[in-house]
Design a protein with these regions (language model features):
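N-terminal accessory segments that position/regulate proteins before the catalytic core
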Residues: 1-457, 464-518
Length: 518
């Protein structure tokens, strides 16, 4: 085993929560150093984007149909960003104000940043690299240059680079923050996928480039422009047709200017360094190894409201209304169908262990949604030998144990009522040790990205059904892995938890428009 894999395995074990101890953090909220959730580049030219609130969008139920493709113009770029990474609303309570975005984020801390690499357009005869500033709904132009690179892509295609500032999560969550950073990258990716579908566009992650190349493309290697480190996550191709995940960007890199415009704003007056995060960031920055491809999800849904209304109303709920959280079998099946097949075009590596509490026609108990049938034999071998593996009305959903898991699910989720008071909660069970050994340490991030994509999809799908969802990053890892599932090794690990039900709306919290002055 190489040193990078050793670092990843050590990081994961060290940052597990248990009944004896939680992963290390400061142990208090250091409000004086709270990071600014909005990155801006001082000195960069701003392109104000038009708001898309009045743009018609297809019903959410039709998003997986072959919708007509919008042209690549400023209006469509604006809509893509507003309905994925933009602000959905502002909230006010007890003198405090905070933004709610379309993409979910652990603790609403938003470590993810987005950069667009665009061909000549928007009355500009040069290609450009710009940063999306969601607070002002604007593009900050970092570089303008000539290149023939876009001639190698399908017409009207462009690139989006995602990056992360780990300090935003580490400020609150300490050494476990790297996990949440990767989940949020997955949240953002799937938010972009959903928004792109409204425009008849497709998004594919490039899987044959290095983190170093992405950093160079986005200007993240120009360290004098940054106070806090910002690390590359992924490069996405946005196109009208499904693209190949393999892309040669050498000509693009050759055409980049040596220095970009704009200086990144300082997010905190000071920082607390977490060496273990720096170590795992370095270990996972290896060249990625492409995964086997798979058919993407295409879900048939009941008629629903406009897509934009669904994504703009996505919220993370802190309290579930237990008495109202009974859901129908059809709602349950719709949620499962939405994430049953591949979201990222790769073979699924994540399965769902569900604590079913209040679902009509389903007995209370522990269930497993097997998202890749290739793993079924292995899962049966590794889980408790006493499990039933009884087939249900939903294909690839198995009843493992009949029991009331409301108390257990709450304990596992760091004693949070949201895990027990909804219709169901779940743990995302990932192929783990063999997966990392086969595909190297970069795969650790990719597993979290897949979990984040599932989480964002469940958020949006629940919203479309009039329900609420909430991601749960705080859970007792091995209480789930070992006690509940019976795992005796690390072939599988639970990486992210989630809950769905009917959320309590606090009338004391006021809502304001996302962009009131625009």
């Amino acid at each position: 085993m190489n040193k990078e894999l050793q670092t990843v395995f050590r990081y994961h074990e060290t940052t597990k929560h248990s009944q004896k101890r939680y992963a290390k953090s400061l142990g208090y909220m250091d409000w004086a150093t709270q990071p600014d959730p909005f990155r801006i580049y001082k000195g960069a030219k701003n392109i104000k984007l038009p708001l898309s609130l009045h743009n018609p969008t297809a019903p959410y139920s039709l998003l997986d149909e072959d919708l007509p493709s919008a042209p690549l113009v400023q209006k469509s770029i604006s809509q893509l960003l507003q309905f994925s990474l933009g602000i959905a609303a502002w909230k006010n309570s007890a003198g405090s104000s905070w933004a709610v975005r379309c993409n979910a984020s652990s603790g609403n801390l938003h470590p993810t940043e987005a950069y667009l690499i665009l061909p000549s357009m928007m009355e500009n005869n040069k290609s450009m690299i710009s940063h999306y500033a969601p607070k002002n709904h604007a593009l900050e132009v970092l570089a303008e240059f000539d290149t023939d690179f876009f001639d190698t892509l399908e017409k009207e295609s462009f690139l989006i680079g995602l990056s992360s500032i780990a300090w935003r999560e580490a400020w609150k969550y300490g050494e476990r923050a790297f996990r949440y950073v990767q989940l949020d990258a997955g949240h953002a990716w799937q938010a972009l996928v959903i928004s792109a579908k409204m425009l008849g566009w497709n998004i594919t992650r490039v899987d044959n480039i290095t983190d170093e190349e992405i950093a160079r493309l986005l200007g993240l290697n120009q360290q004098k422009r940054f106070f806090e480190e910002e690390k590359p996550d992924m490069l996405l191709i946005v196109s009208k047709e499904q693209s190949s995940p393999s892309l040669n960007i050498s000509s693009l890199l050759d055409n980049l200017p040596q220095n970009y415009e704009g200086i990144a704003n300082k997010l905190s007056p000071s920082m607390h360094a977490w060496e273990i995060i720096a170590e795992v960031e370095k270990a996972t920055s290896l060249m990625q190894i492409p995964q086997p491809e798979a058919k993407r999800c295409k879900v048939t849904r009941e008629p629903s409201r406009e897509s934009k209304e669904v994504v703009l109303n996505r919220r993370s709920i802190h309290v579930m209304e237990k008495e109202k959280s009974n859901i129908t079998r059809e709602q349950f099946h719709t949620l499962l169908k939405s994430i049953d097949c591949s979201l990222d075009g790769k073979e699924n590596a994540v399965h769902l262990a569900l604590f079913v509490h209040r679902v009509e026609e389903y007995a209370q108990g522990l269930y497993l949604h097997v998202r890749n049938s290739k793993d079924l034999h292995s899962l049966k071998k590794e889980f408790h030998s006493t499990f039933l593996w009884q087939e249900t009305a939903f294909e690839n959903l198995y009843l493992l144990e009949l029991a009331d898991f409301t108390a257990a699910s709450k304990i596992i989720s760091c004693n949070q009522d949201i895990a027990s008071d909804g219709a169901f909660s779940l743990g995302m069970i990932c192929r783990y040790s063999k997966e990392l050994l086969a595909f190297n340490a970069h795969r650790y991030k990719e597993l979290y990205w897949e979990c984040g994509m599932i989480g964002q999809q469940l958020y949006v799908e629940a919203t479309s059904l009039g329900l609420s969802g909430t991601g749960i990053g705080c859970f007792l890892d091995d209480l789930m892995n070992t006690n509940v599932l019976g795992l005796k090794n690390n072939l599988y690990q639970s990486l992210y938890h989630f809950t769905v039900g009917v959320g309590y709306v606090d009338s004391r919290i006021q809502t304001r428009a996302a962009y009131p002055k625009m």
